[in-house]
C-alpha cells in the first residue's frame, strides 16, 4: 500500500452543521438515565420508586418523592448534574417520571399517546443546611437546603405553564412554554405563521391574545421563611426570604411551623425596582422542591440519635442521684434556689401529652412563674433556659404586644391580600417561651395568651381570616410584686398584680424573696467572686456532678421524644387524696381570713401536679410514674404555689405588728434575750403563734433593729 501523501497526514477539521444536536442528545440520554433509575432502583428486592409512583397514581397524585442519596448511589454523575444545574435537569426528571407514569397507566401501545398531567418531582436531601444569611450570588441556580420558620403564607394563585396564543388577524395558534418560579413571560411581537396559497399576510405588531380556556395552569403559593431565633447572631435582626411553592407542595405548611426547605436559589426582578431604572438589580427567592417539616405532636420531627448516644443516655438515666445532678446542672452560675432549679428541670422535660377518645387534647407542657424581689436571678434563669431548650423564644413584657405574642395580620405589597405572621407563642411551638417583666405587660396583651397557655392554640378572626394556630409551648415568666419588693406584712392579693385567671394557668408559682441571712450572704458572695476571678477554671466553682451543656441539651431532647410516662395506681391514689387535702386546707385558710385566695387551687392544679409527676419520671426515662415521683411533685407544689397561696393572713399580720411593737418596748438598745425565753413569754404566755413571732423577728432583723446571734438563739437589740 502506498504511503500517505502530505495532506492525508494533517489533521481533519470540520464544522458541526447543527450545534444544538449535541445538547439535544445529552438531554435525551439524561432523560433515559432517569427513566432507568425510576424503573430499576431496588432496595431489598423492592422497586421503591416504581411502587411509590404506582400508589400515587391510584389516588390521582401525579408526583414522586426522590431521596437524592439513592440517586447518588445509582448514578453519581447524574446526581451531581441535578445538584449543580437543577433548573435545566429537573424538567428532564419530571418528563422521565411522566413517561414511566404513562407506561404504568397504559400498558397497550394505542393508549400510550394519551396525555396526562406532568408529574412533579419533590426532592429529599440530607446535605448540610445553609442559613439564610449565608446565601450569596454564588448559590444562584444551585440546589440549597435552608432551615427556618414559616411566618407568612399567601392564598393559592394560578400560574400558567403553557400559554395558548391566538393571532387576532390570521387566527394562527402557538403554544408558549413558561418556566417556573417568579419568572415573567414576554409574548412574541410578530406573527410568524406561514403564508398560505399566496395570500397576503398583514398581521400587525403584538398580534397575539391569550386563550385561557386552552392554556395550562398549576397552583402556586408564596411563603415567607424567617431565620429561627436560635440561629440569629446576637444583636442581629432575623432575616427572611420568599419561597415559591407549586402543585403538590402548596398548602402543606402553616405559619409558625419550623421546617427545612430544599429548593433552587433563584432571582426575580421587582416591578418597583424596574420602574426606578435599576434594571441590573434582582431580588432573591427560593423555588421549593422539597419540604421537611415538624411532626404533628408539637415538637420537632424526631431527631436522630446514634447508638452510642442512646447507650450513653440510658447510662445517664440509671445514675442513682440523677434528679439532684440535673437540678445542679440548671444555671450552675446561680447559687442556691434548689427548688426553683428543680421546677425548671420539670418544665424542660415536660409531662405527657394526651389525646382523649373524643379528640380533646390535654397539655403536657408545664408553666412556671417566678415572682419576687429584684436581684434574685430571675432573668438569669430565663436566659439560661432560652439557651438550653431545643426550641426557645425570649421576650420582654414591656416590649411585647398581643399581636407580637400571638399572630398579626399583614398585607402583601404586591397582591394586596392579607396573610398571617406568627408571633412569639407560635414561633416557639414545641418549645418554651420565656417572658421577662411579665408584670409590666398591659392587661389586654396579657389576656391574649390565656388561650395559648391552657388550650395551646391561638384563634384568629381578623380581616376576613378565621383560623387556629398551634402554640404548644411551656411558659416561663418572671415578674416583680406591685411595690417592687415582696412585703410580708401584706397579703398575696396586695403583693401580686395578676388576675386569678392567669395565675391558675401556672403549674408552679414561686415567691422569690431576697432575705438577709449572714451565712447565705457569705456563701453567695464567695460564689460570685469565684465566678468573676476564676473564669478559666470555672468548673471548680460549678456544681458537682454537672452534665456538660451540649450533652444535657441532647438528653432533654431524647427524653422528650422517647418517653411518655403514665401514672401507676399508687401514685394516682396519692395525688387524688392529696389534692382533696390541699383544697380543704386552702378553704380553711380562706374561711379564717374571710377572703378569697388570689392564687386559686382548682382542678387545673391537680393536672399540674400530674404533669410534674410525669416529668420527674421522664428524667430517668421511666415508663411509669411511681408514688415516689408523686411525693416529690406534691412537695414541689406545696413549696411553690400553695406556699404563695397561703401567705400571711390579716390575723397573722396583726399578730406580727403587735409582737413587733412589744419587742421594741421589751428590749432596750444594747440588751439581749434568748430565743427560748421569747417563745415562753409570747407563745406560751400571751398565746401568739410561733410563726408570727418568727416573722416579727425576721422583719426587725431586716430593718437592722435587732441582730440574731449564735445561729438565731440570741436576740440582740442593736438599733432603733
Swiss-Prot record:
<keyword id="KW-0235">DNA replication</keyword>
<comment type="subunit">
    <text>Component of the mcm2-7 complex. The complex forms a toroidal hexameric ring with the proposed subunit order mcm2-mcm6-mcm4-mcm7-mcm3-mcm5.</text>
</comment>
<dbReference type="GO" id="GO:0006270">
    <property type="term" value="P:DNA replication initiation"/>
</dbReference>
<dbReference type="InterPro" id="IPR012340">
    <property type="entry name" value="NA-bd_OB-fold"/>
</dbReference>
<keyword id="KW-0131">Cell cycle</keyword>
<dbReference type="GO" id="GO:0003688">
    <property type="term" value="F:DNA replication origin binding"/>
</dbReference>
<feature type="domain" description="MCM">
    <location>
        <begin position="322"/>
        <end position="529"/>
    </location>
</feature>
<feature type="modified residue" description="Phosphoserine">
    <location>
        <position position="352"/>
    </location>
</feature>
<keyword id="KW-0238">DNA-binding</keyword>
<keyword id="KW-0347">Helicase</keyword>
<dbReference type="InterPro" id="IPR008048">
    <property type="entry name" value="MCM5"/>
</dbReference>
<keyword id="KW-0547">Nucleotide-binding</keyword>
<dbReference type="GO" id="GO:0042555">
    <property type="term" value="C:MCM complex"/>
</dbReference>
<dbReference type="GO" id="GO:0004386">
    <property type="term" value="F:helicase activity"/>
</dbReference>
<dbReference type="GO" id="GO:0005634">
    <property type="term" value="C:nucleus"/>
</dbReference>
<dbReference type="InterPro" id="IPR054125">
    <property type="entry name" value="MCM5_C"/>
</dbReference>
<dbReference type="GO" id="GO:1902975">
    <property type="term" value="P:mitotic DNA replication initiation"/>
</dbReference>
<dbReference type="InterPro" id="IPR018525">
    <property type="entry name" value="MCM_CS"/>
</dbReference>
<dbReference type="GO" id="GO:0031261">
    <property type="term" value="C:DNA replication preinitiation complex"/>
</dbReference>
<dbReference type="Pfam" id="PF21933">
    <property type="entry name" value="MCM5_C"/>
</dbReference>
<feature type="short sequence motif" description="Arginine finger">
    <location>
        <begin position="504"/>
        <end position="507"/>
    </location>
</feature>
<dbReference type="Pfam" id="PF00493">
    <property type="entry name" value="MCM"/>
</dbReference>
<dbReference type="InterPro" id="IPR033762">
    <property type="entry name" value="MCM_OB"/>
</dbReference>
<comment type="function">
    <text>Acts as a component of the mcm2-7 complex (mcm complex) which is the putative replicative helicase essential for 'once per cell cycle' DNA replication initiation and elongation in eukaryotic cells. The active ATPase sites in the mcm2-7 ring are formed through the interaction surfaces of two neighboring subunits such that a critical structure of a conserved arginine finger motif is provided in trans relative to the ATP-binding site of the Walker A box of the adjacent subunit. The six ATPase active sites, however, are likely to contribute differentially to the complex helicase activity.</text>
</comment>
<dbReference type="Pfam" id="PF17207">
    <property type="entry name" value="MCM_OB"/>
</dbReference>
<dbReference type="InterPro" id="IPR001208">
    <property type="entry name" value="MCM_dom"/>
</dbReference>
<dbReference type="GO" id="GO:0016887">
    <property type="term" value="F:ATP hydrolysis activity"/>
</dbReference>
<dbReference type="GO" id="GO:0006279">
    <property type="term" value="P:premeiotic DNA replication"/>
</dbReference>
<dbReference type="Pfam" id="PF17855">
    <property type="entry name" value="MCM_lid"/>
</dbReference>
<keyword id="KW-0067">ATP-binding</keyword>
<keyword id="KW-0539">Nucleus</keyword>
<keyword id="KW-0378">Hydrolase</keyword>
<comment type="similarity">
    <text>Belongs to the MCM family.</text>
</comment>
<dbReference type="GO" id="GO:0005524">
    <property type="term" value="F:ATP binding"/>
</dbReference>
<protein>
    <recommendedName>
        <fullName>DNA replication licensing factor mcm5</fullName>
        <ecNumber>3.6.4.12</ecNumber>
    </recommendedName>
</protein>
<dbReference type="InterPro" id="IPR031327">
    <property type="entry name" value="MCM"/>
</dbReference>
<dbReference type="GO" id="GO:0005829">
    <property type="term" value="C:cytosol"/>
</dbReference>
<keyword id="KW-0597">Phosphoprotein</keyword>
<dbReference type="GO" id="GO:0043596">
    <property type="term" value="C:nuclear replication fork"/>
</dbReference>
<dbReference type="InterPro" id="IPR027925">
    <property type="entry name" value="MCM_N"/>
</dbReference>
<feature type="modified residue" description="Phosphoserine">
    <location>
        <position position="350"/>
    </location>
</feature>
<dbReference type="GO" id="GO:0003697">
    <property type="term" value="F:single-stranded DNA binding"/>
</dbReference>
